[in-house]
Regions:
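Short glycine-/acidic-enriched loop or helix-start segments at secondary-structure transitions
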Residues: 7-8, 33, 64, 88, ...
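Short, hinge-like loop/turn segments at secondary-structure boundaries
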Residues: 38-43, 95-97, 137-139, 168-170, ...
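Alpha/beta catalytic cores of nucleotide-metabolism and tRNA/nucleoside-modifying enzymes
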Residues: 2-3, 8, 106-109, 114-116, ...
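Active-site beta-loop-alpha junctions enriched in small/polar residues
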Residues: 1-3, 27-29, 55-57, 82-84, ...
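Short, basic/glycine-rich phosphate-binding loops at helix/coil junctions
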Residues: 44-46, 87-88, 159, 281
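Alpha/beta enzyme core
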Residues: 15, 63-77, 81-93, 102-189, ...
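Glycine-rich, positively charged N-terminal anion/phosphate-binding segment
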Residues: 1-75
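Hydrophobic faces of well-ordered beta-strands that scaffold small-molecule active sites
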Residues: 22-24, 50-54, 77, 119-123, ...
């Protein structure tokens, strides 16, 4: 998610789950090739398993980024074909590319030929007024011809002409049955459900016929949802850290960062950690004032120490 799943958020996520596969923000190839490559690509080994998610429509540019990423420890590279924002549409990448399967094939072929990583795609059920019963199978079949076999499927259409990104996450109806049918039709592909998923345990049972689940906004707005991922989905021990311990770890992590902008982003990412708690608003206010933050750290820890010793 753009402006959400940066390195600071991923550090927070790793306080809650050691097993969940994390994604970078969607990063446009031009930002990497013409910007600060270290800023966009470097990460700590603790963030793995980690997927680099790219946006773009130029096979040559995508291949160059793949070559760069060969030197960096990513587990997978994902081409985003599902983002519906106006900026993405005007730049002809994201969900807009679902209308151009031949170009997508060229992009993916270039990525596969120049990468030593697994290549995957993130898609929607379709765009605008497409008939998802016909167009989706055709699109997936064409993409699979490149050798890509991992599809993260947001179980909604993307309406590119009329709806905002927020509305595109809410107004087009969820159609999980279409995702299930996709798996039945393409048994050899890995089909991972995305969209509207808010409960790990329920989702494990509801999507047992698929190859996995992908959680986006809910994992950002309520990071504590990740606290039981390891035991429920990976049959491993949960990290079982208290909110106090997680908060202290984040504060110690911020002390290692050199740029104020990184710390500010990290503080914002922490807001959802306290959702539903009695003192959530007070804690968010304390986190929001960067100039006061260092003085407020002990007050925040005290609030958590006194009232919230339960496991996250």
């Amino acid at each position: 998610m753009m402006a959400k799943t940066d390195s600071q958020y991923r550090y927070l996520a790793r306080q809650l789950s050691s097993k969940a596969v994390l994604f970078t923000e969607m990063i446009h190839t031009n930002a990497i090739l013409h910007g600060n490559q270290s800023k966009f690509l470097d990460h700590t080994k603790e963030q793995n398993p980690l997927v680099l998610q790219l946006g773009g429509n130029n096979p040559e540019a995508l291949s160059k980024v793949c070559v760069l990423s060969n030197e960096i420890d990513y587990d997978e590279i994902n081409l985003n074909l599902g983002c519906p924002s106006p900026k993405v549409k005007s730049g002809n990448f994201g969900a807009a590319l679902m209308a151009q399967p031949e170009l997508v094939k060229d992009c993916l072929t270039a990525m596969i030929e120049n990468s030593d990583k697994t290549i995957s795609v993130k898609i929607r059920l379709g765009i605008n007024d497409e008939d998802i019963n016909e167009s989706l199978d055709k699109f997936v079949s064409m993409i699979a011809e490149t050798g890509v076999n991992i599809f993260y499927v947001h179980a909604r259409k993307a309406i590119l002409e009329k709806l905002s990104p927020k509305d595109n996450r809410e107004i087009p109806p969820l159609n999980y049955e279409r995702v299930r049918q996709l798996k039945k039709d393409f048994k050899t592909l890995e089909i991972i459900a995305n969209g509207g998923i808010k409960d790990i345990n329920e989702s494990k049972n509801a999507f047992s016929d698929l190859d996995g689940i992908m959680i986006g906004r809910e994992a950002y707005s309520n990071p504590r949802i990740l606290g039981n991922v390891d035991s429920i989905l990976y049959q491993s021990n949960d990290m079982n850290k208290s909110l106090k311990e997680i908060t202290e770890n984040m504060f110690n992590y911020f002390d290692t960062l050199n740029r104020k902008s990184e710390i500010k982003r990290g503080l914002i990412h922490m807001h959802g950690l306290y959702s539903g708690l009695k003192d959530a608003r007070k804690i968010r206010v304390l986190l929001s004032n960067f100039n006061y933050f260092k003085k407020a750290k002990n007050e925040i820890i005290s609030l958590l120490d006194n009232q919230y010793s339960e496991v996250a």
